[in-house]
A protein has these predicted regions:
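Conserved strand-turn element in the central/C-terminal portion of the radical SAM core barrel
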Residues: 92-93
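N-terminal beta1-alpha1-beta2 module of alpha/beta enzyme domains
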Residues: 1-89
Length: 93
């Protein structure tokens, strides 16, 4: 593993912690892709493949309308605490 001084670029993921993440349209790919279990699986895989950090989408309210884009989300502080408990070395913002 490289030291922090040797690293030139940190790679991270924007996590799917809100409903309807892939698209603002009415098309639904997978309804439950924003669950904690799904986020934990992504976090563990990201850590295993050497990603440096995870970054949540922070929304308190959705956009309303037919899709209520990002209308339901995992609260970010609790989300971060749970993922920090589940992982060993990846940074969680």
């Amino acid at each position: 593993m490289q030291t922090e001084q040797q690293k030139k670029l940190a790679l991270g993921l924007f996590m799917p912690n809100c409903s309807n993440m892939p698209s603002i349209s009415t098309h639904r790919v997978v309804e439950d892709q924003w669950t904690y279990e799904h986020n934990e699986a992504i976090a563990l895989a990201a850590e295993r493949y050497g990603f440096d950090y995870l970054f949540p989408v922070s929304r308190w309210r959705g956009f309303g309308g037919d899709t209520n884009f990002l209308g339901t989300s995992l609260e970010t502080t609790t989300w971060a605490a749970a993922l920090l408990r589940a992982t060993r070395s990846i940074q969680v913002f």
